[in-house]
């Protein structure tokens, strides 16, 4: 892809913006950066690019006539909605508009494995990456996991494996992006404030399969009825995984073991009790990872070893500490109700739950109903605090306390905890009302817990 002397507009200067601009400059493009944030808020990012000749248009989206030269390409950061008037006007002029993973795909070489879904993406992406690394493959783990795909694209070679965690925001802007193996782990309502409807959200997720050919592989959760029905339209070869059903072909659980059945030949992978990371949600992640890596020829011994040793990822049911018999678990990655339900299901001790955060328009009925006698008390904070309280009381869960912030929630939970209890941060909400991302929220939780020991 020749971008030398091409005029490229980057809209959105968030996490992917810096590596994106660096690569575009490296390729000789004339780069214009536009962000609705003002210069004051972006100074630190701009310092990192001070050696590059970049034109900035900050504090607003401009009129097209204000641009100094005709545009050859527009690259939109994932956090920028594609239906804002500025982007609509650019599209109406016939200018190509793509996202960061589309650009990275056009520049990269190698075997692409892409993973999406509402929950489990980060754990599964990390696990798949670890399996390929243990198999001796040069592996890049990128995407919505904290390392922009574009930052590694020019380093890749034809033999590399690129494992991508792909969000709905990233997938809605693809054009040619085609993974050799694509997977949807599950699908429940999320990000409806951005996508407006469940249909739009689902369509964005299914974009992961839209360019696949008959020789490519689509890995799908058989237990998700909606996914199973919609998968009939997929052109790629389908490989199902299931925690609940004995499949005629695919990867599933039989007699407490993960098995793979293909062309009448059954292979035993591992006992589910030997998987290091606990919980049914992690069993599903292990099934998906097994299906994906087997599809690309990884030996069973390597998969088995990795499932026995992989310790999970930070901020996902991460045990932080045990203080005077009270366990503290950081599940800050629980950014929607379904993710937090899975977090609660994986804990077998009485729970003091901390929930709340940015309002994505979620419904919390199923979340509250999932307490199932496990949750002794819930502390709520953030934009969704009142909604959570009202939903809990409507469903006859009355042990709820509203607090101002995470610090107060942790301290009050610890005050009433007894030996054998678990203080669980699993917010069921995004972090953006108080924190830049869920990682910062999780790190703050761990700092608060550490201070309890002092």
Curated annotation (Swiss-Prot):
One Pfam family per UniProt: Mur_ligase_M
Protein name, as recorded: UDP-N-acetylmuramoylalanine--D-glutamate ligase
Function: Cell wall formation. Catalyzes the addition of glutamate to the nucleotide precursor UDP-N-acetylmuramoyl-L-alanine (UMA).
UniProtKB keywords: ATP-binding, Cell cycle, Cell division, Cell shape, Cell wall biogenesis/degradation, Cytoplasm, Ligase, Nucleotide-binding, Peptidoglycan synthesis
Localization per Swiss-Prot or TrEMBL: Cytoplasm
EC number(s) stated in the UniProt entry for this protein: 6.3.2.9
Family per similarity comment: Belongs to the MurCDEF family.
PANTHER family to which the protein is assigned, alphabetical: UDP-N-ACETYLMURAMOYLALANINE--D-GLUTAMATE LIGASE
CC terms in the record's Gene Ontology section: cytoplasm
SUPFAM superfamilies documented for this protein: MurCD N-terminal domain (SSF51984), MurD-like peptide ligases, catalytic domain (SSF53623), MurD-like peptide ligases, peptide-binding domain (SSF53244)
Catalysed reactions, semicolon-separated: UDP-N-acetyl-alpha-D-muramoyl-L-alanine + D-glutamate + ATP = UDP-N-acetyl-alpha-D-muramoyl-L-alanyl-D-glutamate + ADP + phosphate + H(+)
One Gene Ontology biological process: cell wall organization
Pathway(s) annotated for this protein in UniProt: Cell wall biogenesis; peptidoglycan biosynthesis
InterPro entries the UniProt entry points to: Mur-like_cat_sf, Mur_ligase_C, Mur_ligase_C_dom_sf, Mur_ligase_cen, MurD
The keyword ATP-binding is assigned to this record: yes
Major location (coarse): cytoplasm
Binding site for ATP: 117-123
Organism the protein comes from: Alkaliphilus oremlandii (strain OhILAs) (Clostridium oremlandii (strain OhILAs))
Listed GO MF terms: ATP binding; UDP-N-acetylmuramoylalanine-D-glutamate ligase activity
